[in-house]
């Protein structure tokens, strides 16, 4: 049993990290399309082409199920991918409903808002708009595109002054004291929880969709009786090339270590 996890780059490691904790006996194939990152500024047709290639590659490597660990690729391509390939394909969904539920439970639920941060394509896409319309009857959800965070993450620039300055400039457009939740609508954004926590008011919760995505995967594997691995392992690929280089594997290790540190920040 092999599970393929695909992202435009290294943001999807946050989804892999969640999967490693919840599926200790499965084999994983992680595909980072670093040749074409970032996806957030590309056209829908380009993303569909890249995503189709990635899924086919993972199937050729033996994947029995696919997780699209990329909100942008999910938004642009998941319907077409599910129609094209005959295996379970799980996508990402910004945790807007989770944020809305938390807001309703709060003491000031009538007045507090939710901010979704994502890539430009996700922000402009129909999938996010439909999700917000479905769960936000009171019109308390706003969206913000933060494309530079993907670039910062891919270059391993996490808590630097440039990142914090960028975030402060972008968040200055909003009265953050009026918000109760920040939804991370891009898997790359999980690397910046410390900087986000430093800038946001204490009452603003940081919410991502990783746990929900892996729970959906587990449910689907159980339904299809596919989860029967005998030991955990991970193979890494940059686009079509398997990673053997110790330097790159060490780099991936640093990313995973940072993600574990970020899990402590809410």
From Swiss-Prot:
Pathway(s) this gene product operates in, as recorded in its UniProt entry: Cell wall biogenesis; peptidoglycan biosynthesis
Residues at which substrate binds: 7-8, 39-40, 71-72, 187-188
Similarity annotation: Belongs to the aspartate/glutamate racemases family.
Domain of life assignment: Bacteria
One Pfam family of this chain: Asp_Glu_race
One Gene Ontology term from the biological process aspect of the record: regulation of cell shape
Keyword Iron: no
Catalytic activity line of the entry: L-glutamate = D-glutamate
EC number(s) from the headed UniProt entry: 5.1.1.3
The protein's name in its UniProt record: Glutamate racemase
Name of the gene encoding the protein in the UniProt record: murI
Reported function: Provides the (R)-glutamate required for cell wall biosynthesis.
GO molecular function, one term: glutamate racemase activity
